[in-house]
């Protein structure tokens, strides 16, 4: 499943490094190609909310295999696209896979490992995410230069095929433990204060993260004034740090999920403020953004573990709700960050990110209040 996550994240973000040649070949603007990211996010939201009610009593192994096959189909559709409309269909398909796969990830982890190992399992799943974040953009750019952007997307097809066979051989049959939930369950979940605070915390956290993260490159280019090789190195450091953080976070989650979920956004808020205060320092940018990657990339592991513990009987529905919340918050955060960055500059943008992250920390404390397994904070 980690291989599937790697291929999935690589598929989702591959257009970022191939915008120019894709726009040229499909005879549209780079901005229109960029909308392929937006449509995948929109379909991820829809799929995440629909997958549990619509999948009914289907064997979850079969469902995962179908989603993996659809990922390969998406790569082929984009690679063979002769017009913009076909490209967007391919991007919509990968959105369905993103929403469906991630909404089931916590429930699947709970079925595959004992309760004490769920944090480790989620960390392993997310390591595929972190690894793809490190290499997807530079690898896509390299492959695009060697075999063209169509060849780069076609490379995802055999990777999806390998993941499909691997999952078919290794995953056990996983029948739903109870009947398929209806859409009413999403409203009933919000009646639980822990769920309401938790989803609000997740939403504000990802908004705060992407208010800043989306505009790291223009910040480095215009404020820190780094050249292209240095910029690429900083982004690579962020990715590597994220992989390390994802690999290590399970050790801290064993001690206290509550502490991790509150300290991470507070740390990121401090980093956002420090970036404003040390804007012209390249060394500071390396260190601070490396720390940002270390904690930010690992944070979802903590939230997925919180979900598994808070909604053990409704993990699929809760997972769908969380994926929808995350996708919407990323879109809102990126949009808000763009408005602030263009209208008020990087200082206001980064301070807004810090404020949202502090609020997210408080909401995380509220979401984890009353758990006897957690130390009081």
Predicted segments with their positions:
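Structural signature of the two symmetry-related core transmembrane helices
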Residues: 63-76, 259-274, 354
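A late C-terminal transmembrane helix in Major Facilitator Superfamily
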Residues: 310-346, 352-353
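Cytoplasmic helix-loop-helix junction between adjacent transmembrane helices
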Residues: 90-128
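Helix-to-loop junctions at the C-terminal end of transmembrane segments
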Residues: 47-59, 245-257, 341
């Amino acid at each position: 499943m980690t291989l599937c996550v790697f291929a999935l994240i690589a598929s989702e973000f591959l257009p970022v490094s191939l915008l120019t040649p894709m726009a040229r070949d499909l005879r549209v603007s780079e901005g229109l190609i960029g909308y392929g990211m937006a449509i995948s996010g929109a379909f991820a939201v829809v799929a995440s909310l629909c997958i549990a009610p619509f999948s009914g009593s289907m064997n979850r192994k079969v469902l995962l295999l179908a989603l993996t096959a659809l990922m390969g189909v998406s790569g082929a559709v984009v690679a063979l696209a002769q017009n913009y409309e076909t490209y967007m269909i391919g991007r919509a398909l990968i959105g369905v896979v993103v929403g469906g796969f991630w909404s089931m990830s916590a429930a699947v982890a709970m079925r595959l490992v004992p309760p004490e190992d769920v944090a480790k399992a989620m960390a392993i799943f997310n390591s595929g995410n972190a690894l793809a974040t490190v290499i997807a953009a530079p690898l896509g750019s390299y492959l695009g230069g060697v075999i063209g952007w169509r060849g780069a997307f076609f490379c995802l097809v055999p990777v999806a095929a390998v993941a499909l066979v691997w999952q078919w051989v290794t995953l056990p049959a996983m029948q739903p433990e109870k009947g398929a939930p209806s859409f009413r369950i999403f409203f009933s979940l919000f009646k639980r204060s822990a769920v309401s605070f938790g989803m609000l915390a997740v939403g504000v956290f990802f908004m705060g993260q992407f208010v800043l993260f989306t505009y790291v490159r223009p910040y480095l280019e215009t404020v820190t004034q780094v050249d292209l090789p240095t910029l690429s190195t900083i982004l690579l450091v962020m990715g590597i740090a994220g992989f390390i953080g994802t690999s290590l976070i399970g050790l801290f989650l064993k001690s206290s999920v509550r502490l991790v979920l509150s300290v991470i956004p507070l740390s990121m808020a401090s980093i956002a403020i420090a970036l404003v205060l040390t804007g012209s320092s390249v060394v500071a940018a390396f260190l601070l953004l490396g720390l940002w990657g270390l904690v930010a990339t690992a944070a979802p592991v903590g939230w997925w573990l919180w979900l598994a513990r808070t909604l053990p009987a409704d993990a699929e529905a809760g997972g769908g709700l969380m994926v929808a919340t995350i996708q919407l918050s990323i879109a809102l955060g990126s949009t808000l960050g763009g408005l602030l960055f263009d209208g008020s500059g990087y200082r206001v943008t980064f301070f807004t990110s810090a404020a949202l992250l502090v609020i997210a920390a408080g909401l995380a404390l509220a979401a984890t209040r009353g758990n006897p397994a957690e130390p009081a904070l």
